[in-house]
Regions:
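Generic beta-structure capping elements
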Residues: 49, 154-156, 224-226
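C-terminal segment of classical bacterial N-terminal signal peptides
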Residues: 21-35
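N-terminal amphipathic, basic helical "cap/leader" segment at the start of enzyme domains
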Residues: 36-147
Length: 228
């Protein structure tokens, strides 16, 4: 008899506890889910961009251009451009553009009139890869072979670890976009013209750059002075 009384007491307390949890959870539902619908919200009027903000001024100038002068870029401009794109900006080796889990899978190649080079951010150098004018391989548009510089972005899938092919393509595309936008912003600050492009002869260019099978060209970006 005593055992039944104990079990009955335990069950009663358990039921009360469960009921309390249910009521407590129900009390939080409006907070988590939101009691109101979107129809109850009012538009938020945003302020106009502040022209005194340096970042705003640069973004106002950011644009794509497909007309380039053949004038070469000075070494100082080329150096700053590459650092802005994908340079090391902290003692721990992190870059001017983020990458997922700091994989740093993107390699930046500079295709110049005399040859193709690989940007080495740690050494602050352009390392020769191949001699010759490969600019025409960096795109199908006529201006590509007239501009003094074509940046070619290459993702090293080996650095992305065990990602699936789909995820590797996603990460490499996102990382490339971040770097390319850095180039756009730097070009806006220097009065340079630039345009990012996907129309690239990837097989021929991969051969010229001596890429491995697990290195994939993502995009190309033409840079130069505006054509006057």
């Amino acid at each position: 008899m005593e055992r039944k009384r104990v079990w009955r007491t335990c069950l009663t307390r358990s039921a009360a506890a469960v009921t309390g949890v249910v009521f407590l959870a129900a009390a939080f539902v409006p907070v988590v889910c939101g009691a109101a619908s979107a129809a109850d919200l009012q538009p938020v009027q945003l302020a106009k961009p502040n022209p005194d903000n340096p970042a705003i001024r640069l973004l106002e100038k950011r644009s794509s251009s497909r007309e380039f002068a053949s004038q070469p870029l000075p070494v100082e401009v080329l150096s700053n451009l590459l650092w802005a794109a994908w340079g090391i900006n902290r003692p721990n080796g992190h870059r001017t553009a983020p990458s997922a889990n700091n994989k740093q899978d993107i390699d930046v190649y500079a295709v110049l009139p005399d040859g193709a080079y690989l940007y080495d951010a740690k050494a602050s150098q352009l390392k020769p890869v191949a001699a010759g004018d490969f600019r025409a391989l960096a795109g199908s548009q006529p201006f590509v072979k007239e501009a003094p510089l074509n940046l070619v972005y290459v993702s090293d899938y080996a650095k992305l670890g065990q990602s699936t092919e789909e995820m590797s393509a996603f990460f490499s595309g996102a990382h490339t976009g971040l770097i390319a936008e850095n180039v756009y912003i730097y070009c806006a600050s220097e009065g340079l013209a630039t345009v990012v492009r996907a129309m690239v002869d990837k097989p021929a260019l991969a051969k010229a750059l001596k890429l491995r099978p697990d290195q994939h060209i993502t995009l190309s970006q033409t840079v130069g002075y505006p054509k006057r």
